[in-house]
């Protein structure tokens, strides 16, 4: 880039030249110091951080929370939604992206509880749905939850993972795109070790 910009927003997310590029462009056209790159990201990022928030709000032995946590930790949350509502997704060529949009509408949107997306989510996770709606109402701002989860995401990425990467891998150059970290391929094993350690213990 002949001009590089970066700015942290009010919720801790870093915006740069890289964040405005499509994933395919970053993957197929960018290098770091002439070296091939790859990225690692948080599976089902926003639902993952919601699961961490819910541990303080629900009984951790609750079967619904256990299922939700297992799905997001294994990156299977959107697949679970698709599996239970095949008719809703049958006409879409990118079902996972559609399931992600559905989830974001429920968690972060100014949508009513009677919307089809809300009813689908509530059918699978009624207690978690009630918590989400309750937070929106109690805070008087439907954006509160999304802002909180973005702050948690930023703390995880920058406060923990990126911080440790720079401490443990001398001379490495990386860039981030919200919940993902891109690095030279030669550092794969060490970066993955650091990332997985924080992910497991968060």
Predicted regions and their residues:
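Extended, Lys/Arg-enriched charged tracts that mediate electrostatic binding to polyanionic substrates
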Residues: 1-21
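Helical catalytic core of nucleic-acid polymerases
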Residues: 19-143
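Catalytic palm active-site di-aspartate
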Residues: 41-42, 103, 172-185
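Short, basic interhelical loop/turn and adjoining N-cap
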Residues: 93-94, 186-190
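Adenine-nucleotide phosphate-binding core of ATP-dependent small-molecule kinases
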Residues: 141-159
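Active-site palm subdomain of RNA-directed nucleic acid polymerases
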Residues: 155-177
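Polymerase palm active-site segment centered on the conserved acidic dipeptide of motif C
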Residues: 188-202
């Amino acid at each position: 880039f002949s001009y590089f910009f970066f700015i942290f927003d009010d919720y801790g997310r870093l915006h740069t030249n890289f964040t405005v590029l499509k994933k395919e462009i970053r993957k197929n056209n960018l290098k770091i110091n002439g070296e091939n790159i790859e990225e690692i990201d948080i599976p089902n990022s926003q639902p993952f951080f919601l699961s961490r928030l819910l541990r303080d709000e629900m009984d951790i032995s609750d079967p619904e929370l256990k299922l939700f946590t297992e799905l997001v930790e294994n990156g299977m949350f959107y697949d679970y939604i698709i599996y239970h509502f095949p008719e809703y997704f049958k006409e879409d060529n990118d079902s996972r992206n559609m399931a992600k949009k559905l989830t974001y509408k429920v968690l972060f949107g100014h949508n009513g509880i009677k919307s089809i997306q809300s009813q689908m989510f509530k059918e699978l996770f009624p207690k978690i749905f009630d918590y989400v709606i309750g937070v929106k109402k109690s805070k008087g701002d439907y954006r509160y939850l999304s802002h909180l989860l973005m702050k948690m995401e930023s703390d995880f990425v920058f406060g923990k993972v990126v911080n440790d990467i720079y401490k443990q891998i001398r001379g490495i150059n990386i860039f981030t795109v919200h919940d993902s970290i891109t690095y030279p391929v030669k550092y794969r094993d060490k970066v993955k070790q650091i990332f997985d350690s924080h992910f497991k213990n968060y």
